[in-house]
Amino acid sequence: MLGLLGLTGPLTQAHADPGATPQAYPIGGRILGLETICGDCTVEKFTSECTGLLEAPVFDRAGILWLVGILKGVIWRVTPDGHCTVGVQLPPEIKFPAGLRFAQDGTLYGVAMGSGLFSVDLSSAKATLIANGATLGGFPDGGFHGLDDIFIDHAGGMYFTDAAGSSVFNPVGQLFYRDAGGNISRIISGGLMFPNGVVLSPDEKMLYIDEWGANRILAVPVIAPGIINKGFGYVFATLNGGHGPDSMTADSSGNIYAAHYGSSEIVVFAPNGDYFGAIHLPAGAGSDPTNAAFHNGYLYITEMAQHTIWRVKTKIPGIMLYGGQ
């Protein structure tokens, strides 16, 4: 969706064999192997102190990890030694937080499945609901069904997925964009099967949206901030097994990393859709990774079923985000 540094006892580790035959994603595509991504891909347990269905890991410039406990209604604060404390207790009007991102000015923004878009002033630990799709930033039809994930571009705008109520049999999921001035537009009005993660390529010319309900990742060209070319959108990758892709991140080379919920793995794709392989969590780690975030040479992975954060050393730095690497 800890305690690696300063704790006694052996690390919990798993090794992905770069020479092993991984699942074929996509069918007919090239399989590149993980050596250039994470070497032997040793996965270490970082912490299991945070609870409440973990999601949305983001790092600030000081190296503090922030993430949500969905059921607890909190934003956890995790220090570099893996100690987890409540950083922000969300107010009652912000229900089921699901995604977080830092803006350029250091403000933390988030989306909540039961509420809408919110901002957080970390200096005061105060969270404020800023758009709910109805009375705040409203649309005549009520706007939001239930927001799931968020990504902030270099223009200060925010893409966020609207997933609640959508599925493979009810493809009513949406995508919204809030520009730097606070204006919200609906840029995909239905047709998505539980849109979950959303991320931009490093040059911000391609937007990736994954559909949990369809077990696939879509790609659509970006014309300008908040303006996409749906006529040239396509299926970027189709996953096998599990339930579906949850949230995503990207590295500085444009490779896409998707948390494959139900499969205990992070799947990695090249910008052209070729499949590198799957970074597997260790046996017994839980099957439900929800998200991943780069920091200081590692990819940190949240796993929901056992409220644990794992990490794997990577060879390519992550996409530059406002919180810092």
Task: For each feature predicted by the language model, list its residue ranges.
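A short helix->beta-strand "capping" segment at the edge of beta-propeller domains
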Residues: A20-G52, G233
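A short beta-strand motif characteristic of beta-propeller blades
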Residues: T42-S48, H83-L90, K126-P140, N183-S189, ...
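Beta-rich, blade/repeat-based domains predominating
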Residues: T47-L65, I70, P91-G116, T135-M158, ...
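Beta-propeller domains
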Residues: W66-Q89
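Short loop/turn segments immediately following the C-termini of beta-strands
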Residues: I70, A112-M113, A163-G165, W212, ...
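A short loop-to-beta-strand structural motif that recurs across blades of beta-propeller domains
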Residues: V74-W76, G116-F118, G173-F176, R216-L218, ...
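Short loop/turn segments that connect beta-strands within beta-propeller blades
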Residues: T79-H83, D121-A125, R178-G182, P221-P225, ...
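Glycine/small-residue-rich hydrophobic helix-like segments
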Residues: P221-T290
